[in-house]
């Protein structure tokens, strides 16, 4: 992107992801398409020590270091982190299988999963809280595995991207988040 910016092929050194199930996803380079989101963007500075896509946030009120990753199917934390999160999420039970941690819940309810950046809350919709079923139970779209990432980093994958338009601003070393339309 830096090369395109230097060649004046981009207005700004940024890109914007808006991922949707089915049609309507977009990837914009060089400018922000505000028709893709509601409200204003919430900007969060990126700490260059951690890397560009790693920012501090909260998951259901718990402090979290998060890696923003469009290529991950789930939201992933360590098993310890997931167990701690589930203990504070009514209606969800924790189970382990094959070295992975899972949250399961009655498919007739929708557990509250809220991700916060810069003081703004982004609530996962029912469609994005559940990822499959196990009998009469639904599986939470947040899983636990011990990935070896430093600082027990959460990986914010597809369920977060499906609800939020995200701007990666390289010029100002920040990320912008807004709920999708």
Go through the PLM ranges and name each one.
Residues 1-181:
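Active-site or ligand-binding cleft "flap/edge" segments
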């Amino acid at each position: 992107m830096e090369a395109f910016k230097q060649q004046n092929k981009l207005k700004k050194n940024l890109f914007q992801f808006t991922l949707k199930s089915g049609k309507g996803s977009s990837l914009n380079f060089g400018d922000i398409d505000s028709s893709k989101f509601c409200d204003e963007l919430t900007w969060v500075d990126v700490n260059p020590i951690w890397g560009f896509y790693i920012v501090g946030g909260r998951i259901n009120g718990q402090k979290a270091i998060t890696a923003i990753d469009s290529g991950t199917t789930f939201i992933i934390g360590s098993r310890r982190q997931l167990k701690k999160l589930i203990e504070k999420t009514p209606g969800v039970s924790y189970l382990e299988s094959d070295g992975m941690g899972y949250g399961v819940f009655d498919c007739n309810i929708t557990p509250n999963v809220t991700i916060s950046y810069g003081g703004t809350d982004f609530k996962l919709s029912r469609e994005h809280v559940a990822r499959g079923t196990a009998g009469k139970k639904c599986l939470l779209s947040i899983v636990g595995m011990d990935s070896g990432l430093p600082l027990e980093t959460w990986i914010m994958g597809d369920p977060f991207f499906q609800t939020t338009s995200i701007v990666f601003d390289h010029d100002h070393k920040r990320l912008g988040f807004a709920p999708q339309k």
